[in-house]
Amino acid sequence: MSRKGTRSDRKHIAMERISILFSQAESFFSWNQEYSHHCVRSARLIAMKERVRIPPWLRRRYCRRCNAYLVPGVTGRVRIYRGRVIITCLTCGWHRRIPTTRSTTTNGKEKK
């Protein structure tokens, strides 16, 4: 049995489902953290199956190792160290390092 719909339709539907699952993970986190982790796992499975990239602002909200939904101060720690934002998962201890960019050069003029 073949898949119905074009590639762009399936990609669009997958992105909608991923964003819905992340919003559910955020809203249910205070009541049930395991359900939030399940939503993240489901969103990642959808992205892998349809070969869709999860947007960067959503990628920073989960742990790649244990699929935990990261909330700063509860399941994740956010620190700035040597020009990087370091996000640490408090469930498994995994670190994500995100470089920060500067908008000006060393002499104070803006980059173009």
UniProtKB/Swiss-Prot annotation:
Pfam families: Rpr2
EC top class named in words: hydrolase
Residue ranges the record marks as coiled coil: none
Compartments in which it is found: Cytoplasm
Source organism, top-level taxon: Archaea
UniProt keyword annotations, A-Z: Cytoplasm, Endonuclease, Hydrolase, Metal-binding, Nuclease, tRNA processing, Zinc
Record-level Gene Ontology MF annotations: ribonuclease P activity; zinc ion binding
GO biological process: tRNA 5'-leader removal
InterPro entries to which the protein is assigned, alphabetical: RNP4, Rpr2/Snm1/Rpp21
Cofactor binding note of this UniProt entry: Binds 1 zinc ion per subunit.
Ranges that cross the membrane: none
Entry binding sites for Zn(2+): 63, 66, 89, 92
Major site of localization recorded for this protein: cytoplasm
Reactions catalysed: Endonucleolytic cleavage of RNA, removing 5'-extranucleotides from tRNA precursor
CC per GO annotation: cytoplasm; ribonuclease P complex
Known EC number: 3.1.26.5
Cofactor entry: Zn(2+)
Similarity comment: Belongs to the eukaryotic/archaeal RNase P protein component 4 family.
Subunit description: Consists of a catalytic RNA component and at least 4-5 protein subunits.
Function: Part of ribonuclease P, a protein complex that generates mature tRNA molecules by cleaving their 5'-ends.
Protein's name according to its UniProt entry: Ribonuclease P protein component 4
Gene, per the UniProt record: rnp4
